[in-house]
Amino acid sequence: GYQHFFGPMAGGVDYFSHCNASGQHDLWLGEQQHRESGYLTDLISRKAIDFVKASLAANQPFFLSLHYTAPHWPWEAREDAALSDSVKDNLFHLDGGSIETYRRMIHHMDEGIGALVDCIDRLGAAQDTLIVFSSDNGGERYSDNWPHVGGKMDLSEGGIRVPWIVRWTGQVPAASLSAQTCITMDFSASFLDAAGVKAHPDFPLDGQSLLEVFRHPAHQFERPLFWRMKHRNQAAHRKGTWKYLKIDHHEYLFDLEHDPRERANLRDRHPDQFQSMKAAWQAWDATMPEIPDGASVSLGYGLESMPAR
């Protein structure tokens, strides 16, 4: 586990009261509840900067896993403290928010990331620090995942294709682009490789190192990817530009190079490719633990709250 922790345990909390959807205070420093006034995004940014400063002052190598709750609901920017009491019983905030509020929430996060990067540069650690920015899923509510269809809780591209930005001064060519397909589990393999550390033999990694891609963005290797989700009985497999997708009882085959919006179902035009992709997903799924029958899915909102995406 981590040596230090600061933040909430729940996925979303009020940005000012720091209470979760059950109304319980949910801000922790290590394993102890912590109370500190302030906008949560700013508090997380300051703690991250303090950690980096202390590590560099002690000449101690560090790994910082920085997870903002922004721009997760409730829809509160830095200037919206007055909203805190009114949303305490409805953190999903289904009747609130706006594109402008969403923009400001992202801007506050961006300010914190910028301050952290400035700190690393100012302390002369840029060439020794690999920085990765990404997201756990596509956006929901006020975000726009164009040109992709869908969002959070979907295995269509709008739900799973997210930014992946890397900075490592002297190692990653500035302003370069890569077409390499990758997935979150590749983080750990890449970080260990960059640090020159082997994974523990008792805990083999599922991910693959992207270090060669970092240094040579034109380099690519085949990286089959698999997903499954209880919500709507979804399944997906990507290999190269091909993608197999199942939603409810409907199955699709897409060529993402020519159809990133997943509008042209090619399963009947390319039946062999479709069956191969489906069989590969089934073989992978057979190696995974079964999803318990009692596992539940709660979106927090539905068609009664807003139209479908």
Per-range role (PLM):
Residues 62-67, 106, 113, 130-135, ...:
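Beta-strand elements within well-structured catalytic alpha/beta cores of enzymes
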Residues 187, 239, 248-250, 256-309:
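Long, internal low-complexity/basic segments
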Residues 127, 167, 174-235:
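Polar, surface-exposed loop/tail segments
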Residues 1-61, 68-77, 88-94, 100:
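Formylglycine-dependent
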Residues 8-12, 65-74, 133-141, 206-207, ...:
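Short, solvent-exposed turn/loop segments enriched in Gly/Ser/Thr/Pro and often Arg
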Residues 1-3, 58-64, 125-131, 221-223, ...:
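Loop/turn elements at helix/coil->beta-strand transitions in domains of secreted/extracellular proteins
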Residues 1, 73-79, 83-86, 111, ...:
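Histidine-centered active-site microenvironments of extracellular/periplasmic hydrolases
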Residues 32-39, 96-103, 151, 171-182, ...:
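Active-site rim elements
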